[in-house]
Each structure stands twice: as C-alpha cells, then as structure tokens.
Amino acid sequence: MKIALSALLLLLLGDFVATFLYHVPEHVFGRFHTIVHHSPRRSFVCYAWLNRQPTALVFGFFGFFSYFLWVPLLWPLSAKGVLLGLCLAELHVIWRHQFSASYSTPAWMQRLCRLLCITTPERHWLHHQNANLAYGDIFTFYAVPAQHWLKLLRKLKKKLHYRLLA
C-alpha cells in the first residue's frame, strides 16, 4: 500500500509542479520549450548539441526536477514507491511522445486512460499542435486549471511589458 501511495503522490505532485511552475510559465515567459519541444526535432539534447546551446539542457532538467524534488519527502514512506513513480513518469514521457502517423493507442487503453485521467499520445499531440490545449504531463485534470493559469500569466506578462515601456 505504501509503495502505491508514494508512487501516486510522486506522480501527482510532480505533474502539478511540472505543469504549473515549469511548463505553463515556460510557454509564457520562456523560449526554449517552444523552440525545442514543439519543433520537429523535439529533443533538448539534440537541440543543445546541434545548435551549440547547452543552456537548453537546463530547461529539460526542470521537467525532470519537478518529479525528483519529491524524492526526499516520499523516500521515508517507500523507497520502492518513489523508484516506481520515477520509472512510471519516465515511461509515460516516452509513451506520450509516440507521434508516428501509424501509432494509435489501443481502444481499451484509451478508455482506461480516460477513466484514470491519464494523458495519451493522441492527447499530448493536441498540445504540440496547439500550445493552448491539453496541459498536464501525466494527468488530464490539470488541463483546465492550467489554461486559466496560462491566461493569467499572459495578462501578467502584458502588464509587466507595459510597465517596462512606461
């Protein structure tokens, strides 16, 4: 039970931090995420290497760090659960980036993911096509609050921009 609880907490908390403190703000204030993750190459490592921009790796690290920062808190609850959660998070990253035209998530798995509010590759592809949609790295229930956060941050950016010009 502790294994499952710590794995689930790591995924929930990590996805929350990744969505609201990294991913959405990066779409508003940053540039590397959009250039790298929403480009045809889709790789922080490839971008950093090919364009001689090692700082791009820092932004790739932020996505990972959102999950890793919970390790000290959850490790005492269950080390195995933490390791399971980190493995599941990484496997989900790999799975949700299946953008081959021939790939289709099996119908039974789509139903299960919808029931558990888990992002599928098809849903994640919506985000790559339109950066205003389908937020939440792992969990779909973060999408609507993330869209509100996105709008709020854009308004804040606009206000800051006007203040700097004044």
Question: For each of these PLM feature ranges, what is it?
Answer:
Residues 1-166:
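Hydrophobic transmembrane helical bundles of multi-pass organellar membrane proteins
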